[in-house]
Swiss-Prot record:
Entry comment, domain topic: The Q motif is unique to and characteristic of the DEAD box family of RNA helicases and controls ATP binding and hydrolysis.
Catalytic activity field: ATP + H2O = ADP + phosphate + H(+)
Transmembrane segments: none
Protein's recorded name: ATP-dependent RNA helicase DBP8
Gene: DBP8
PROSITE patterns found in the cross-reference section: HELICASE_ATP_BIND_1 (PS51192), HELICASE_CTER (PS51194), Q_MOTIF (PS51195)
UniProt function note: ATP-binding RNA helicase involved in 40S ribosomal subunit biogenesis and is required for the normal formation of 18S rRNAs through pre-rRNA processing at A0, A1 and A2 sites. Required for vegetative growth.
GO terms of biological process kind: endonucleolytic cleavage in 5'-ETS of tricistronic rRNA transcript (SSU-rRNA, 5.8S rRNA, LSU-rRNA); endonucleolytic cleavage in ITS1 to separate SSU-rRNA from 5.8S rRNA and LSU-rRNA from tricistronic rRNA transcript (SSU-rRNA, 5.8S rRNA, LSU-rRNA); endonucleolytic cleavage to generate mature 5'-end of SSU-rRNA from (SSU-rRNA, 5.8S rRNA, LSU-rRNA)
Length: 437
């Protein structure tokens, strides 16, 4: 059920250590959010927890705060593990743990696909205090790296599943079982599940029998997550677009007066579409980067750094970027391809209008997307309005010819470089290595 908690308490009153409150203050984080006020005291009491709150609500501090507070009382060995579905989200969480624990010389290990397995094994052998990982790569170490590397997992006090609704799907099932199997039994550790979408599968965990010697699981939902799906500061609009000229409409929207200087994330459903758009927009002098699962990790990291630093003002991404990533300056989200799952629309759109800021989410609708839009509008309980910033005549007059030329050149270059074959090879390598994202 949804619980109401006063947000007038400060972090010290919630029970966090003095040093951690000072660290938060140095980061200008002084007032707890609802999810933090609701979960931190109960976690500090030793309770397992399910926390649900909209994207951008401060869920990381809701679990990191109590973990760091209790770790600081005995700062030795492997203390906690955070599992999350994507590499970029793992990197972000690791950065937050490192920043929060900087006063205490915290050791944080990042264990994700695409990075050196040997270097990660060496990090794990040094017994980091906290491990932030994607399930596939951590499972690989558990199965292959030996007890010197992963033996410390048997003594961890905390397991966190961030974006729990995704981690509990079949995609991660085998790797998650491997990871959990290397940890202490659940009656000897705290398990914390956090998500922006509390699914029936997550909620059903409340009905599990209470372990002997443990308190009942605590579930806290902010603003009834299932009914209040998007921020009130988010403006949702649509553009009716002929399928064969979507790129021209996109270019016209990105360069119109309203958005010519805006930072934007463009979501597509396929990696090939992301690459075509990246090359097309780059040829049209748009500062652009891309992010998708088939990119080498160094390129993914570089793209995120460029976008955060505003070296690229547009990021083209698949749904690897739709969860949890906190880039406060994003002003515009474009759903270039409409997702089949309405919750995916919610997570994508949540990359803007964060922490009370205003933002726009604009969806490109072709004749095949009508049923999907109807499902999305039913899920968010509101109707989208038509965007008035792009018109057929303007697209035809200003954009169509040069955009079509840039797209043709992009497709020819990709064919020459055997992009599709390279993608298949990368996918096979990913599957072989047991890396999910």
């Amino acid at each position: 059920m949804t619980e109401e908690v006063s947000r007038k308490q400060n972090f010290r009153q919630l029970g966090l250590s003095k040093w951690l409150v000072e660290s938060l203050d140095a980061m200008r984080i002084r007032t707890p959010t609802a999810i933090q006020s609701g979960c931190i005291p109960e976690i500090l009491k030793g309770r397992d927890c399910i926390g649900g709150a909209k994207t951008g609500s401060g869920k990381t501090i809701a679990f990191a705060g109590p973990m760091l507070t209790q770790w600081s009382e005995d700062p030795t060995g492997m203390f906690g593990i955070v599992l999350t579905p994507t590499r970029e989200l793992a990197m972000q969480i690791a950065e937050q743990f490192t920043a929060l624990g900087s006063y205490m010389n915290i050791r944080v290990a990042l264990v994700v696909g695409g990075e050196s397995i040997v270097d990660q094994a060496l990090q794990l052998q040094r017994k980091p205090h906290f491990i932030i990982a994607t399930p596939g790569r951590l499972a690989h170490h558990i199965l292959n790296s030996g007890d010197d590397t992963v033996g410390g997992l048997k003594r961890v006090k905390y397991l966190v599943l961030d974006e729990a609704d995704i981690l509990l799907t079949e995609t991660f099932s085998n790797d998650l079982k491997t990871c959990v199997g290397a940890l202490p039994p659940k009656e000897k550790r705290q398990t914390l599940l956090f998500t922006a979408t509390i699914t029936d599968q997550v909620r059903a965990l409340q009905d599990a029998p209470v372990q002997k010697g443990k308190q009942p699981l605590f579930c806290y939902e902010v603003e009834n997550v299932d009914n209040v799906a998007i921020p009130s500061t988010l403006n949702t609009e649509y553009v009716l677009v002929p399928e064969h000229v979507k790129e021209a409409y996109l270019y016209q929207l990105l360069t119109c007066e309203s958005y010519a200087n805006s930072t934007a994330i463009i979501f597509v459903n396929r990696t090939t579409a992301a690459e075509v758009l990246r090359r097309t927009l780059k040829a049209l002098d748009v500062r652009v980067a891309s992010l998708h699962s088939q990119m080498p990790q160094q390129e993914r990291t570089n793209s995120m750094h460029r976008f955060r630093a505003n070296a690229a003002r547009v990021l083209i991404a698949t749904d690897v970027a739709s969860r949890g990533l906190d880039i406060p300056t994003v002003e515009l989200v474009i759903n270039y391809d409409i997702p089949s799952d309405p919750d995916t629309f919610i997570h994508r759109s949540g990359r803007t209008a964060r922490a009370g800021r205003k933002g726009d989410a604009i969806s490109f609708i072709t004749q095949r997307d009508v049923s999907r839009i109807e499902a999305i509008e039913a899920r968010i309980n509101m109707k989208m309005t038509e965007c008035d910033k792009v018109h057929d005549t303007a697209v035809i007059r200003k954009a169509l010819t040069k955009v079509s030329k840039a797209k043709r050149e992009a497709l020819m270059a990709m064919e020459k470089e055997n992009f599709g074959e390279r993608r298949k090879l990368q996918k096979r390598k990913t599957q072989k290595d047991g890396k999910r994202v």
